[in-house]
């Protein structure tokens, strides 16, 4: 078969199909009174034999076409299949569904509402059989009062299997204990014991203090307990040991050059409040009475230290051999430096800041003592402070601030300071 023959055959088939289609459209437009479908059956038996003659005329003259009949536009929209009409009308019926809106349980209707009502009347569902067999009833879950019990949540959330308790974390165990109304403090072992129904720590009897002392003490309470029990006895023992140490004859301080046979009266109360560098406190006269005619070794040492501080020019042997008399009192230590501290109004001796460092000594009458020995000691002490001759023997010399502290011949300033014994 050549190409021209195949194209001619396809053209004939196409023209035949077109003629049959035009014929059926023409018959449907002409039969306006009948409601039958022209695609299913013919309108009359007279037109049936004419069907095979029409394609024959087209085969003879394929290019000739029959004139198109008049078209009725008002007839076309009424010819619709009942299936198509139902298909397009069904979405309109389903469009009023309100499944996306929330409806309270009181307003629900239909089979779903009835199912929910039945579930609420039956109560919560029972746990499965395997869960019933593996779980034990918890003693804490029993109602202790006869009041109305609250509805219990689902059992699969609260109750846990005994074999799976060790696999839970501490946070999960505490959450379960909170839901059951149990305390959540403690270690994981304590939490597991509470979950299994053991005795909670609230109900355990508190151990007595005797039991605690018999057992190993807690390290945080051990120092405090020992400190409170040993404090009074330690203080009393230490005070007694110190008194015995200074009053004993084998004390190393007893070899001091101070003679113990020198009679001396009891010191006056003015000597008691003076500060001493020795760390040993003075013994109280009430528990250990001393004879009024002699001084104790500790008092003699304190008096020697005080005299050595106030009289730096004297030798230590002279101070120790000197007899202490009640009327022979040493002058008190002055709290202020000799000189005027008024910086605004200059003194008659000098002007400006030099008046602060000038040695304007007080009058001799203010520093006099009842004893001539005390007067001589005070004059020597003032001479040592001022670095010049005694009072009344000449013009005042340079003060202690202008003295050469590095001069070994003069009295040094740090000799006045109390040295540790």
Swiss-Prot record:
Pfam families: SAP (PF02037). Residues 191-214 have a biased composition (Basic and acidic residues). Residues 165-199 form the SAP domain. Residues 104-156, 188-296, 322-406 are annotated as: Disordered. Residues 208-421 are annotated as: Transcription activation. A motif (MEF2-binding) lies at residues 12-28. Keywords: Activator, Nucleus, Transcription, Transcription regulation. Expressed in skeletal muscle, brain, placenta and spleen. It is found in: Nucleus. Interacts with MEF2C. This is MEF2-activating motif and SAP domain-containing transcriptional regulator.
């Amino acid at each position: 078969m050549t190409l021209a023959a195949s194209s001619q055959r396809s053209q004939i088939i196409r023209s035949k199909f077109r003629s049959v289609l035009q014929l059926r459209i023409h018959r449907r437009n002409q039969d306006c009174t009948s409601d039958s479908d022209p695609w299913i059956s013919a309108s009359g038996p007279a037109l049936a034999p004419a069907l095979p003659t029409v394609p024959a005329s087209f085969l003879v003259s394929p290019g000739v076409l029959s004139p198109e009949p008049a078209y009725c536009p008002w007839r076309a929209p009424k010819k619709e299949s009942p299936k198509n009409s139902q298909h397009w009308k069904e979405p309109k019926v389903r469009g009023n569904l309100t499944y996306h809106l929330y409806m309270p349980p009181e307003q629900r209707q239909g089979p779903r509402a009835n199912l929910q009502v039945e579930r609420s009347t039956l109560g919560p569902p029972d746990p499965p059989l395997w869960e019933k067999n593996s779980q034990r009833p918890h003693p804490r879950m029993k109602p202790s009062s006869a009041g109305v019990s609250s509805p219990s949540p689902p059992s699969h959330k609260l109750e846990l299997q005994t074999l799976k308790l060790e696999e839970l974390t501490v946070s999960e165990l505490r959450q379960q204990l909170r839901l059951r109304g149990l305390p959540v403090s403690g270690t994981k072992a304590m939490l597991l014991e509470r979950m299994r129904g053991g005795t909670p720590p609230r109900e355990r009897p508190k151990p007595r203090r005797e039991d605690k002392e018999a057992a190993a003490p807690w390290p945080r309470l051990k120092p405090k307990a020992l400190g409170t029990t040993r404090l009074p006895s330690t203080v009393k023992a230490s005070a007694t040991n110190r008194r015995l140490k200074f009053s004993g004859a084998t004390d190393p301080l007893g070899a001091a050059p101070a003679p113990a046979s020198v009679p001396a009266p009891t010191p006056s109360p003015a000597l008691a409040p003076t500060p001493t560098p020795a760390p040993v406190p003075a013994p109280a006269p009430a528990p250990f009475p001393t004879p009024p005619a002699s001084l104790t070794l500790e008092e003699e040492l304190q008096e020697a230290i005080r005299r050595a501080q106030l009289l730096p020019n004297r030798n230590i042997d002279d101070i120790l051999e000197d007899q202490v008399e009640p009327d022979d009192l040493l002058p008190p230590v002055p709290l202020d430096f000799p000189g005027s501290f008024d910086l605004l109004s200059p003194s008659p001796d000098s002007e400006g800041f030099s008046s602060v460092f000038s040695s304007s000594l007080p009058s001799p009458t203010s520093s006099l003592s009842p004893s001539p020995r005390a007067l001589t000691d005070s004059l020597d002490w003032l001479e040592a402070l001022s670095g010049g001759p005694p009072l009344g023997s000449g013009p005042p010399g340079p003060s202690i601030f202008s003295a050469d502290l590095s001069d070994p011949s003069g009295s040094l300033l740090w000799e006045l300071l109390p040295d540790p014994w």
